[in-house]
Amino acid sequence: MEMVVLVDHAGDPIGVQSKADVHGQSTPRHLAFSCHVVDEQGRLLVTRRALKKRTWPGVWTNSFCGHPAPGETLEDAVSRRAEFELGLSIDHITCAIPNFSYVARDASGIEENEHCPVFIARAVSSLTPNPAEVAEAQWTSSSELKSAIDAAPWAFSPWLVEHFTELQPLIAEHIVEAEDDD
């Protein structure tokens, strides 16, 4: 049974609960993460959530999301989910927005209530998306993604819509830092 870490309003751990029990009509705040993957050309990977996903099926979102297990570091959880959702190896995992939180309700009435740090990482292998998680994947520029979000925010996950404006200037900075480290 997959467990998630419950957190207070400041993002500090206060307990654990099964993932299946956490996501419902009145979801307690819990720890999650979002990750944006960039390639060697500086393009961002966006994915469309699988149609069988319980929340926000079929919407476009960041590269992948997930929940750290109790006792697991966020960076380890990011690496684990990159492999699970995308069959992807990543490096230069950086927490770009450490204090992002959001509450949103999807069309089925399921609420998300997450303290959700936003990461940027670099792809170091090719993609092999898991069809249970990802319906489609596409590489795009940061400016093209911003234009698409502005034109049709309803086609994207609410967490992506909320954090992308803050994230966009940090993406180029991350790419330069990763290149400098090589």
From Swiss-Prot:
E.C. designation(s): 5.3.3.2
GO cellular component: cytoplasm
Residues that coordinate or bind Mn(2+): 23, 30, 67, 112, 114
Pfam families the UniProt entry points to: NUDIX
Predominant subcellular localization, coarse grouping: cytoplasm
Keyword check for Metal-binding: yes
InterPro entries: Idi_bact, IsopentenylPP_isomerase_typ1, NUDIX_hydrolase-like_dom_sf, NUDIX_hydrolase_dom
Subcellular location field: Cytoplasm
Residue intervals of the Nudix hydrolase domain: 28-162
GO biological-process terms attached to the record: dimethylallyl diphosphate biosynthetic process; isoprenoid biosynthetic process
EC top class named in words: isomerase
Family of this protein: Belongs to the IPP isomerase type 1 family.
HAMAP family (alphabetical): Idi
Protein name stated in the entry: Isopentenyl-diphosphate Delta-isomerase
Organism: Brevibacterium linens
Gene: idi
